[in-house]
Amino acid sequence: MKDFITEAWLRANHTLSEGAEIHLPADSRLTPSARELLESRHLRIKFIDEQGRLFVDDEQQQPQPVHGLTSSDEHPQACCELCRQPVAKKPDTLTHLSAEKMVAKSDPRLGFRAVLDSTIALAVWLQIELAEPWQPWLADIRSRLGNIMRADALGEPLGCQAIVGLSDEDLHRLSHQPLRYLDHDHLVPEASHGRDAALLNLLRTKVRETETVAAQVFITRSFEVLRPDILQALNRLSSTVYVMMILSVTKQPLTVKQIQQRLGETQ
C-alpha cells in the first residue's frame, strides 16, 4: 500500500517557496489538502524512485517518466545550429544547447551553463557542510539556481521565487541596509568571522562570477538585455548569500519571521 503525504508532512520537510520544485518518493501519494497546498504555491512536483528515475503525474495521476531538468517525456531530433542539419551521431565537439539544438562546445552560452553548474555544485556542498539553521536558505538557493538553468535551457521566462519567504525586493533592501534591518553593518570578509561566513562567502563570490558571465552572454554590444530575468535573479541570489553572511556574524541573528516583521514596519 502506498504511503500518503500530508500537508503537515510537507510543511515540516520542505520550505515550499513559491515556484520551486520538490521531489517525493515514487511510492507515495498526496492527500487532497497536500496537493492543494502544492498547487497554490505553484510548485513542480516530481516523484523519484530508488533508481533515481523521475516521474510526473499525468491527467489520470499516473506516473510518467520525464527528463530531470526539462520535465519533458519527449526526445526530439537535435540539429546543428550552424548547418541546420539533423545530427545523427554527436561528435565530441558538439553538445546540446537545447533538446532541439546542438552547438560547438566553444559557444559562450555553454560557458555560462558551466559556471552555473559549478555554482549549483557549491550550493549542494554547503547543504552538507553547514548546520541546520542555514538549510532552508540553501535549499531555496539550490532550487532557484536549478530554475535558472531550466529557464535558460528551455528558453522560457524565469518565474518569481521567494527565498525563505523573502521576495527579491526584501532581499535587495536587506543587503543594502543591513544595520537597519539585521543589527549589523556591512562587512568585509575576514578569518575572524568564522567558518560559516567563510563558506558562505565562497558561494557569494561564485554567484557573482556566474552573474558576470551571464552578463557577457545576455547583454549585447548595443546594451540590449536579452535575459533580464536571469540577470536579476543572480543579482538577488548574491544579495541573499550576503545577508546570510551578515546573519552568521551577528551575536543574536534574527529569525526570518523577525526580519519580515522589520521589513513590514518600515514599508
From Swiss-Prot:
Gene3D superfamilies: Cobalamin adenosyltransferase-like. GO terms for molecular function: ATP binding; corrinoid adenosyltransferase activity; metal ion binding. Its cofactor is a divalent metal cation. It is found in: Bacterial microcompartment. It catalyses: 2 cob(II)alamin + reduced [electron-transfer flavoprotein] + 2 ATP + 2 H2O = 2 adenosylcob(III)alamin + oxidized [electron-transfer flavoprotein] + 2 phosphate + 2 diphosphate + 3 H(+); 2 cob(II)inamide + reduced [electron-transfer flavoprotein] + 2 ATP + 2 H2O = 2 adenosylcob(III)inamide + oxidized [electron-transfer flavoprotein] + 2 phosphate + 2 diphosphate + 3 H(+). Binds 1 divalent metal cation ion per homodimer with both subunits providing Cys ligands; Fe(2+) gives most activity and is possibly the physiological cofactor. InterPro entries: AdoTrfase_EutT, CblAdoTrfase-like, CblAdoTrfase-like_sf. Pathway: Amine and polyamine degradation; ethanolamine degradation. One of its GO terms (biological process) is ethanolamine catabolic process. Transmembrane segments: none annotated. Keywords: ATP-binding, Bacterial microcompartment, Metal-binding, Nucleotide-binding, Transferase. Disulfide bonds: none annotated. Its EC number is 2.5.1.154. GO terms for cellular component: bacterial microcompartment. It comes from the Bacteria. A divalent metal cation binds at C80, C83. Converts cyanocobalamin (CN-B12) to adenosylcobalamin (AdoCbl), the inducer of the eut operon. Is not active on cobinamide nor other intermediates in the adenosylcobalamin synthetic pathway. Allows full induction of the eut operon. Belongs to the Cob(I)alamin adenosyltransferase family. EutT subfamily. Homodimer. This is Corrinoid adenosyltransferase EutT. It comes from Escherichia coli (strain K12).
